[in-house]
Swiss-Prot record:
NCBIfam families: acpS, pantethn_trn. It comes from Clostridium botulinum (strain Eklund 17B / Type B). This is Holo-[acyl-carrier-protein] synthase. Coiled coil: none annotated. The gene is acpS. Belongs to the P-Pant transferase superfamily. AcpS family.
Amino acid sequence: MIRGIGTDIVEIERIKKAIKSNPNFINRFFTQKEIEYFKLRKFNANTISGNFAAKEAVSKALGSGFRGFGLKDIEVLRDELGKPIVNLSDKLYKMFNLDNYNIFISISHSNTDAIAYAIIEVI
């Protein structure tokens, strides 16, 4: 059963400016594993923007936006084929009673924008 869907679009230039103007931007909003992935991608703004949009999309699919939790509670990584995967913090498991669920996420970008779409399925 589908529990929720969410989508988000981010201007890549806005993320570039945030990274330049705030040296703590990446550490504030992304987990250590995400930052390690960004290092492999040479801190590409498209990649960072895509992850940011994915976190927003998942929060919308949860139905709450970011109320009672933060961006680091949603971790967006890649599997061995490069497919984005989502890990949620224990806090979110408890907040939303997510015992048996799947999160499907799609991330794409153009030269100017990154977009993500999330579906949460309860099994």
